[in-house]
């Protein structure tokens, strides 16, 4: 846990320091550095940014029950950044664990799906300024916690000791952490199914590992249904941002400029309030 906190703090210090430098000069115009940038040139021709997302991460992104459209905090924020640049976004529904490779291969211009800025991912792609910081949380049915005599667990290894199988979406950071800790893990291709199976009484999973505000969203949804889900484990986590290919420096710089403007003028905090995401 100490290692996770240390790494997270280093990443936060780097990205926040960069953010402060940009926000100090808020009205930054779109840039086009010298040299060829095929991704940005194509975006300029089409006026469209191709973005991949997995819409099973409420309140970051989800399908509207009425319209079927992809909506959510990150969706609204990315759309606002694009509008700031005189562009629009075409949203592509794609599995979470396929987004980074699709961005690297040029099939998508950007990934927007609650991506944490981790050291491993920084080797593969570049990230915009962070829009949020999160906590990692493992949640359980309160009835299960009571039956096992659990109030709070302090390490991931405690779940192994207590014989608790933890569900998680495949391909994300939490899966790696659980496996490294020797915890019995069950994976799903989307982020909603682990939570739904947890409350349905599926005996193959007794807990789910995800980040706030995703965990908070599900806890509140289940509470509305009279189902008590509680946090059994929590720890500080990584900041969250949008990602682009390392060959997309112009898109990255321009999106950072747009995002800095939206932080400065209060749009980001307004959207967080709208989607019930803490502003700290």
What are the language-model segments listed below?
Residues 55, 133-137, 212, 216-260, ...:
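Periplasmic-binding protein-like
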Residues 52-57, 92-97, 106-118, 141, ...:
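Beta->alpha turn/N-cap motifs
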Residues 29-34, 75-84, 141-151, 163, ...:
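Extended ligand-binding regions for polar small-molecule ligands
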